[in-house]
């Protein structure tokens, strides 16, 4: 907390460029300091908390990192929470395997393709293995230990134990709780033990996506922050196939996906990416996908969810006028 503008600016400038700072300022202090800190990479978002919204709202429009001008504390907390959720989702790394016939891809194709095949076999095995109450209890206990002292998540765990049923799995997956965080982390890091313990819930997601499988061709979008190294790996494999080794959440609304990227500040070694995906349910795909809006914790998000291990063909990668990389893919 700072009363002095110079001290505040100096503190921000001394932070590492990898730090991510959310700044809350008063209206008067904001007018003094925002012009000097707005361009700093460490600052990802600014909120103006003041008594006179009208006096500062028009002025704040000049600065893209100013997310909102608010007079109510609850509204401020709600806005920061919502924006943080979006930022986390976009920055969460994707686990991608490439199946390539490109001998110049820079790696042994046997090694690269082996990872791709393994990811496919893993999903198929998980869907066939029976689960037991012992495994479910072990998962719950591991999560309780992980979130010890976090009363919000412990309450979520208690509710999960009491009320979970297979038809609620999409609701639980889309709610920002231990369930989403732990499952996604396990899939992203290929933590086989944790994935094994989650297998009954992965099966439940699979069955629900099958039940609500989209019946018509869809074009969907996903905002993503991607490392330059990851992006280069995809650019070197245009025309090849990729497997997404986690649940792949997308939106039917392109304008919203682009808007979210427009507000994001990237790290030095990262780029803003928009996936554009054509998904036709009439092709012989083995992995289901569905519009889960009616079954989601956030029913207004027009979310289309693809099953773990969904395979896409990389069609094209180009940068648009807003310096966003557009990756065009087709579901296989």
Residue positions per predicted region:
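Mono-ADP-ribosyltransferase
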Residues: 1-332
């Amino acid at each position: 907390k700072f009363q002095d503008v110079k001290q505040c600016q100096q503190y921000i400038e001394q932070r590492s460029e990898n730090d991510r700072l959310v700044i809350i300022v008063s209206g008067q202090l904001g007018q003094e300091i925002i012009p000097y800190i707005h361009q700093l990479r460490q600052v990802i978002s600014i909120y103006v908390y003041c008594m006179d919204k009208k006096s500062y709202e028009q002025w704040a429009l000049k600065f893209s990192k100013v997310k909102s001008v608010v007079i109510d504390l609850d509204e401020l907390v709600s806005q920061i929470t919502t924006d943080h959720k979006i930022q986390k989702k976009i920055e969460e790394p994707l686990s991608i395997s490439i199946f390539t016939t490109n001998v110049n891809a820079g790696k042994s194709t046997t090694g690269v393709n082996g990872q791709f095949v393994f990811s496919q076999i893993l999903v198929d095995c998980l869907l066939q293995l029976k689960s037991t109450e012992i495994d479910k209890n072990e998962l719950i206990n591991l999560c309780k230990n992980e979130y010890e002292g976090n009363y919000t998540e412990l309450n979520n765990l208690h509710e999960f134990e009491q009320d979970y049923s297979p038809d609620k799995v999409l609701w639980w997956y889309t709610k920002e709780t231990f369930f989403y965080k732990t499952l996604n982390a396990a899939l992203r890091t290929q933590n086989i033990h944790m994935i094994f313990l989650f297998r009954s819930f992965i099966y439940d997601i699979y069955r629900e996506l099958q039940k609500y499988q989209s019946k018509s061709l869809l074009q969907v979008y996903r905002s993503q922050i991607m490392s330059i190294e990851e992006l280069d790996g995809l650019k070197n494999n245009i025309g090849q196939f990729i497997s997404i080794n986690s649940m792949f959440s997308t939106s039917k609304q392109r304008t919203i996906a682009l808007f979210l990227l427009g507000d994001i500040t990237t790290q030095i070694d990262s780029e803003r990416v928009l996936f554009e995906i054509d998904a036709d349910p009439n092709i012989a795909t083995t992995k289901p996908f569905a519009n889960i809006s009616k079954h989601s914790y956030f029913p207004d998000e027009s979310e289309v969810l693809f099953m773990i291990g969904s395979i896409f063909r990389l069609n094209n990668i180009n940068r648009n006028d807003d310096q966003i990389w557009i990756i065009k893919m087709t579901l296989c």
